[in-house]
Regions:
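NAD(P)-dependent short-chain dehydrogenase/reductase
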Residues: 90-133
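Hydrophobic structural elements of the Rossmann-like NAD(P)H-binding subdomain
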Residues: 1-2, 42, 97, 158
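Substrate-positioning beta->alpha
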Residues: 28, 79, 110-111, 127-147, ...
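NAD(P)H-binding glycine-rich loop region in Rossmannoid oxidoreductase-like domains
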Residues: 1-24
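Glycine-rich NAD(P)-binding loop of the Rossmann-fold in SDR/ketoreductase-type enzymes
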Residues: 17-28, 75-76, 134
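Active-site Tyr-X1-5-Lys
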Residues: 34, 68-96
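Conserved Rossmann-fold NAD(P)-dependent oxidoreductase catalytic core, especially the SDR/UDP-sugar
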Residues: 24-72
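Mid/C-terminal beta-alpha module of Rossmann-like enzyme folds, strongest
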Residues: 142-209, 226, 231
Length: 233
């Protein structure tokens, strides 16, 4: 069984349903697999579930640390991973992957593919942060290979490249043959932006283009090491 279903949202209004689906949904999936004697479950989590620490460099050995830098999405993915580990303790074979920001074909109105929509519209700014990125095909291929293998009770970071948002946004713009974003969206500017978007939301049903969580996470420098998956797969 491959379990990749989850809500990815940084909007306050989505938190209750995100906690319910991401955590309870995974618990239900684990219970069903145990009840039906499923051979193995492959769970696609996220690098967000690794948490945040002061080093800004992460491997699979990092321990979760509760702090203000963890988004609610990250918390739900961490807790959903715990449901997988519960299943392992109860006799279920399982493997977990932790992809970085996934890029590839998809619905531009959802999750990380909104990058394409934003840049295509003529985004003038780029965040100053850095993060791990990966092609959706690498994500799918890795979980298939790991789930079919004899590997169990392990987790793997799936990141092709640690890149700045500046590079990613400019590459996307170049592919569209449109002007590249040239202005830095500093943490200070983003703090103003998410508050402004919050005020606009009071008078409109439109989703804010930036939230408190996305403003802060996009300013962070996060480096993810992929040595384990490269060496073992």
């Amino acid at each position: 069984v491959y379990h990749s279903a989850a809500i990815v949202s940084f909007l306050k209004k989505d938190r209750d349903i995100m906690y319910k689906i991401n955590i309870e949904g995974t618990a239900n999936m684990v219970n069903a697999c145990l009840a039906e004697n499923v051979k193995k479950i492959g769970f696609i989590s996220s690098v967000a579930a690794i948490g945040r620490n002061k080093s800004n460099t992460y491997t699979e050995k990092n321990k979760w640390s509760t702090n203000k830098d963890n988004s609610h999405y990250a918390i739900t993915k961490f807790k959903s991973e715990n449901e997988i580990w519960r299943g392992v303790q109860e006799g279920l074979d399982a493997v977990i992957t932790n992809p970085g920001i996934i890029l590839g074909p998809g619905d531009w109105s959802r999750s990380s593919t909104t990058f394409f929509k934003s840049v295509k519209k003529g985004l003038p700014y780029y965040p100053v942060g850095k993060n791990g990125f990966v092609d959706v095909r690498d994500v799918s291929n890795s979980i298939i290979q790991l789930t079919k293998s004899k590997i169990t009770a392990e987790k793997y970071i799936i990141v092709a490249e640690n890149s700045s948002y500046e590079k990613i946004f400019k590459t996307i713009a170049s592919s569209f043959k449109i002007p590249q974003p040239e202005k830095k969206a500093t943490p200070f500017l983003l703090e103003i932006a998410w508050r402004y978007e919050g005020l606009k939301k009071l008078f409109s049903s439109r989703k804010p283009s930036i939230t408190k969580e996305t403003a802060r996470t996009s300013s962070m420098i996060n480096i993810y090491e992929n040595n384990k998956i490269v060496e073992e797969l």
